[in-house]
Every structure is written in structure tokens, then in C-alpha cells.
Amino acid sequence: MDFITGFFGSLNFEVIFQLTFVSLILISGPVVIFLLAIRGGDM
């Protein structure tokens, strides 16, 4: 049990959330461009 609490205590959740949101933003850009190309340019 000490291993689990120590593991979650040592994780920096702010850094994890920031990296998650940055990766979502980086992925969403090409996805929007790809969808626009498929639909012929009109949303």
C-alpha cells in the first residue's frame, strides 16, 4: 500500500495534464485539416 501512495504522491499531475492538453491541441490541428480536405473545404 505504501508503494501505491508513494507512486501517486511522486507523480506531478499538473505536468501530466499540461502534456495531455498540448498533445490534444497538436493532434486536433491536422485532424481538422484532414476533415476539411475530405468534405471539400466546407464545414
Swiss-Prot record:
A core subunit of photosystem II (PSII), probably helps stabilize the reaction center. PSII is composed of 1 copy each of membrane proteins PsbA, PsbB, PsbC, PsbD, PsbE, PsbF, PsbH, PsbI, PsbJ, PsbK, PsbL, PsbM, PsbT, PsbX, PsbY, PsbZ, Psb30/Ycf12, peripheral proteins PsbO, CyanoQ (PsbQ), PsbU, PsbV and a large number of cofactors. It forms dimeric complexes. This is Photosystem II reaction center protein Psb30. One of its GO terms (biological process) is photosynthesis. Belongs to the Psb30/Ycf12 family. Keywords: Membrane, Photosynthesis, Photosystem II, Thylakoid, Transmembrane, Transmembrane helix. It is found in: Cellular thylakoid membrane. The chain crosses the membrane at residues 15-35. The keyword Transmembrane applies. HAMAP family: PSII_Psb30_Ycf12. It is a single-pass membrane protein. GO terms for cellular component: photosystem II; plasma membrane-derived thylakoid membrane. The keyword Transmembrane helix applies. It comes from the Bacteria.
